[in-house]
Amino acid sequence: MPSIIDRVLKISDNRVLKRMQATVDAVNLLEDDFRALSDAELRAETDTLRARHADGESLDLLLPEAFAAVREAAGRTLGQRHYDVQLLGGIALHQGNIAEMKTGEGKTLVATAPAYLNALSGRGVHVVTVNDFLASYQADLMGRVFRFLGMQTGVIVAGQTPAVRREQYAADITYGTNNEFGFDFLRDNMAWSLDELVQREHHYAIVDEVDSILIDEARTPLIISGPAQGEANRWYGEFARLVRRLEADTDYEVDHKKRTVGILGPGIEKVEDHLGITNLYETQNTTLIQFLNNAVKAKELFKRDKDYVVLDGEVQIVDEHTGRVLKGRRYNEGLHQAIEAKEGVEVKPENQTLATVTLQNYFRGYEKLAGMTGTAETEAAEFTSTYGLGVVVIPPNRERQRVDRNDVVYKNEKVKFDAVVDDIAERHAKGQPVLVGTTSVEKSEYLSTLLAKRGIRHEVLNAKNHAREAAIVAQAGRPGAVTVATNMAGRGTDIMLGGNAEFTAVARMQELGLDAAEDPEAYEARWPEVLAQAEAAVEDAHREVIEAGGLYVVGTERHDSRRIDNQLRGRSGRQGDPGESRFYLSLTDELMRNFNPGVAQRIMNSPSIPDDMALEFGFVSKAIQNAQAQVEGRNAEQRKNVLKYDDVMNRQREAIYTDRRSILEGEDLQDRVRRFVEDAVGNIVDAATEEGQATDWDLDQLWRDLAELYPVGISQEDVLDEVGGRGRLKAEVLKRELVSDALLAYEDREAQVGSEALREAERRVVLASIGRHWQEHLYEMDYLKEGIGLRAMAQREPLVEYQREGYTMFQNMLAGIREDAVRTLFQAQISAAPAPTSLPGVKDARAVTMAPQISVEGIDAPQRPAQLRFTGPSEDGQSAVTRSGTDSGATVAAGTNRRSRRQAERRGRRG
């Protein structure tokens, strides 16, 4: 029976849908008018709507005409007419909500109407999806609708140059993945000039598969990093060998639910004996604890052929949800190196963070945000609290006919898989297509072996075979097809009964050498014929599958999240098609083992229940639901915790990025640098005079410190003579005199190098100083967060301590930026070469304003790392992506490894 809250929410949903339906009715009234327009007249509607919006008419008022235009254009280009429920979804998206629409309801087409409407402002629209394939596919297909209406479509994928990316972002509607959009945001905030920027403002984003991107992937931040300077660390191999001698429950404990480890007393003693140290937890040994913890995690929590595979001598992560190999991706904070050491392959060096942001805070930076998914209701509260997004459940175009069978539970995994194969064989024999979901590469290959032994032809989608993934999924609805997919592999590609005609037609057009972007007229002329051929080819097969019962979905294990289970089930029964689903479980499945071991153990130990008996006890199903609720609650709490800590960083990040952008856009820094001079000199004087009387102050040391900052032009004697002796010297007088002297020195510096040269030098030096200190600050904040949990032992709230200390560190960083910039501006060699008399490719140089060539020693050509690493969440929110590139304009400060410096500083303090 639904709760009172559920009933209230249902009433609220009905009211929202009723208001939206009135708008849909207005669109429908315009349909005949727009159908009567010629292609040219329909195209001209875009110019008319843009002009009306520019004159002050709101997008809400323009919505009926804009949606009617898109509906008509889609019919003429794709042969697809928006259903009323698709227009409802589009209205929900325009209003900044999440539209929950079941699988097969045509969410890709839904996004076209709100994207077009919001692009009328000229400020750009981003359509975000989960992988490069879907971004390109959707941009190509839906781009035909937008081009027909006179709008440009772009797509952002990995490997594009900055020039190409800039062009794609300049389009009216740009498709891409969450990681690519986020990385470009970070790269833009590492830029040294406006010419390096690629993105426009964050105006409006429509996030496809929004639950995957904003929920599953929210715990893993986006990170751009470069190789840290310093010696390669030998400790990974040392600790990999050491932990082989340690025993679980004796030397260390493992919490599989929380995925954490803890070292026990006997283990600590063994480590100390092995390393020849007296106390592992002394300050100078702190870094060793991280190596030890990572080595134990690599041994106990990360399993080969489940969490990762070893291919060509490299450890490659496996996506937990899709089962695909995430080529080039790496775990953070030394964990990947620990796994490499465990497997005996080459250990690649650590990296230092150059820029980072969580997806939560990246997407909260959009002026308006919306999303689509088939499964959002279970996370509605989190969407509202974190992103301010409401969830609107859109009714299906046709009532669902899928039958969801009760779970079948067996005592062990072997019997379970035998039953799965028997079921598949029976369905396959009558021509019913079957989609089987597994939770790991290992299990998909085990099932594949069993199917092969029974002579059942099948396709496998997992980490070792994903090149043809979308094509295989698109045809998984053909008669008798058996497809084994590691969880949600191929999500975003519709499984249509009999085969996906649209996908087949697109592939055929590619074979014919036709490209919708390069030659849209030729493409549109040939498309109807090719699509008709594809539809005819699948028509008979469609009828055959309908008679066999539709797509049968088999789950071989419950996922931690009910939402993922629902996504698997949702592959069947699209658009009112018949279908069926069932989950086969065992009491040894990971979910039961970790979260309800007592229930599982009691049944397994019961002699009255044979191994091959299928269990359908109500309390078993209840135990599974409780286990899933526990995991979902834990994951939600982790995401909330990540956000709380990142909110502290986000305020700092916004301040730094806003500052950098104003400098790039040409802010005159003269007054700011003068304040830098005042603050830097003032801080040094304050530090020298904060204790004791004037007679106690070490003025000789003060003058030496100032001489490292700027050329001091006033002597101690000058100051003392001015005040009448040392006994009458006041700190504020000393500070005033020295600040005045420093400002005079800066005026002399300007006279020496020239105003124009100094203004450009100020811009470069301040940017370089911000970049250098921000990178260092990111490390310091990470270091602070790693140990902040220990404050709870002292009865202190870790988050409050993190906020307080983080603020202090941020203020110290700003002081460091000021002092560093002042020192460089005084001491670096600044020169201005004559302006060039001509430019390559410019015939009339008189038409170009020629500026002098400014050179600032040490920062003219920022050093870039040979390889940048781009780390972000995979489709399961767990993994990290790595690829090389130096096109971002990022700078890396040279120097020793910061962990080594930190350790040295600790030793110094102890000494």
Curated annotation (Swiss-Prot):
Annotated spans, Disordered: 856-911
Q: Which reaction does it catalyse?
A: ATP + H2O + cellular proteinSide 1 = ADP + phosphate + cellular proteinSide 2
Location(s), subcellular? Cell membrane; Cytoplasm
Task: Return the similarity comment.
Answer: Belongs to the SecA family.
Q: Which CDD domains match?
A: DEXDc_SecA, SF2_C_secA
Kindly give the PANTHER family that the UniProt entry links to this protein.
Answer: CHLOROPLAST PROTEIN-TRANSPORTING ATPASE (PTHR30612:SF0), SECA INNER MEMBRANE COMPONENT OF SEC PROTEIN SECRETION SYSTEM (PTHR30612)
**What would be one Gene Ontology cellular-component term for the protein?**
plasma membrane
Q: Where is the composition biased (Polar residues)?
A: 876-889
Q: Name one GO molecular function term.
A: protein-exporting ATPase activity
The catalytic activity of this protein is classed by the Enzyme Commission as 7.4.2.8
Name this protein carries in UniProt:
Protein translocase subunit SecA
Q: Matching Pfam families, A to Z?
A: P-loop_SecA, SecA_DEAD, SecA_PP_bind, SecA_SW
Q: Which InterPro entries match?
A: Helicase_ATP-bd, P-loop_NTPase, SecA, SecA_CS, SecA_DEAD, SecA_motor_DEAD, SecA_preprotein_X-link_dom, SecA_SF2_C
Q: What's the main place this protein lives?
A: membrane
What is said about its interaction partners and assembly?
Answer: Monomer and homodimer. Part of the essential Sec protein translocation apparatus which comprises SecA, SecYEG and auxiliary proteins SecDF. Other proteins may also be involved.
Give the species: Micrococcus luteus (strain ATCC 4698 / DSM 20030 / JCM 1464 / CCM 169 / CCUG 5858 / IAM 1056 / NBRC 3333 / NCIMB 9278 / NCTC 2665 / VKM Ac-2230) (Micrococcus lysodeikticus)
